[in-house]
Amino acid sequence: MLGRHECTISESVSALDPTAQEPEYTLVPSTSRDLVRDMTLNMEDAQAHLKEHGWVKIPAVLSKAEAEDALSRLWEAKAASEARGECTFQPILDPNPANVRVFYLPELDAYWRDMLVNPTALDLAKSLLGDQLLVSNFSANIARPGAESMALHSDQSIVLPAPWLDVWAVNVIWCLTRMTKENGATLYIPGSNKWTTWEDVPDNAPDLLVPFEADAGDIVVIDGRLWHTSGSNVTEDEDRAILFAYYSAPHMRPLTNWSAKLPKELQETLSPQLKELLALSHIGYVVKGDLTYMAQKYPSEKGTTAVSA
């Protein structure tokens, strides 16, 4: 696994183009002599773009060789999951079995657990959710030729009632193969992270979808309020394999109950960081406000005597 990503900014859409809804914003490998300074500055820019537009793409977080290794491990995870009786076709999500789903990846291989704490991905998720975020789910979707699109949705609209005013979920999409419009790339609606109610979704929403196109090894980080769907794989012989590392705010119940799903023997081997991320610590970090606010607003005075009603 790679560590923190060294990068600079590349915007291929001119700010002077009046038809551009938002920049095609990605980060490319740095050529700066001061890599540490350059990395810090541009990760801040990436976080700012994620906050404003609801997504950001970071290339080459995995090398091509690492992406190929991860893809091989994913097919092994599919076989292991099916051997345990887990269904890899979910009719509630996908129109046909050409869309393969593999759930509960942290249970299947330490490789996936390491991916959850990748510094680049985790820092971007924390930039929206804060330091005490949780892993709500970690799964895979392989769109094989013939796979069709699922329903349009935002991640938060599925689990939370409107209005969606705050970011309470972040999905990190790990591309193990290239992701193109033809092979079923995730489709999204630019600017939809600003929608706060069902009424904000326009009647022509499907016509507004554009693809996230990426190379094997890239990640795409999306705000839980960004409306998106899977694309259809219209190729004859090309799989599109991606992972979804789904992080949530600490006061939200995770989609997966890891304390019940992960064997106790496995839980005991996890690092303190992973135990907290998987909500296996005995402490729940659910405080969002400031516990000292009212004490500061109404400071007690020494010598004051309580008055009974």
Curated annotation (Swiss-Prot):
Reactions performed catalytically: 5-dehydro-6-demethoxyfumagillol + 2-oxoglutarate + O2 = 5-dehydro-6-demethoxy-6-hydroxyfumagillol + succinate + CO2
Record keywords: Dioxygenase, Iron, Metal-binding, Oxidoreductase
Tagged with keyword Cell membrane: no
Superkingdom assignment: Eukaryota
Swiss-Prot/TrEMBL cofactor(s): Fe cation
E.C. number: 1.14.11.82
Induction behaviour: Expression is controlled by the fumagillin biosynthesis cluster regulator fumR. Expression is also under the control of the developmental and secondary metabolism regulator veA. Expression is significantly up-regulated during infection.
A Pfam family of this chain: PhyH
Class in the EC hierarchy, top level: oxidoreductase
Gene3D superfamilies: q2cbj1_9rhob like domain
InterPro entries reported for this sequence: Phytyl_CoA_dOase-like
MF term (GO), any: metal ion binding
Pathway(s) per entry: Secondary metabolite biosynthesis; terpenoid biosynthesis
Disrupted-gene phenotype: Completely abolishes the production of fumagillin but leads to the accumulation of the intermediate 6-demethoxyfumagillin.
Biotechnological and industrial applications of this entry: Fumagillin and its derivatives have been intensely studied for their potential use in the treatment of amebiasis, microsporidiosis and rheumatoid arthritis. They have also interesting antiangiogenic properties by the irreversible inhibition of human type 2 methionine aminopeptidase (METAP2).
Residues binding Fe cation: 153, 155, 228
GO biological process: fumagillin biosynthetic process; terpenoid biosynthetic process
Family: Belongs to the PhyH family.
Role: Dioxygenase; part of the gene cluster that mediates the biosynthesis of fumagillin, a meroterpenoid that has numerous biological activities including irreversible inhibition of human type 2 methionine aminopeptidase (METAP2). The pathway begins with the conversion of farnesyl pyrophosphate (FPP) to beta-trans-bergamotene by the membrane-bound beta-trans-bergamotene synthase af520.
UniProt protein name: Dioxygenase af480
Organism: Aspergillus fumigatus (strain ATCC MYA-4609 / CBS 101355 / FGSC A1100 / Af293)
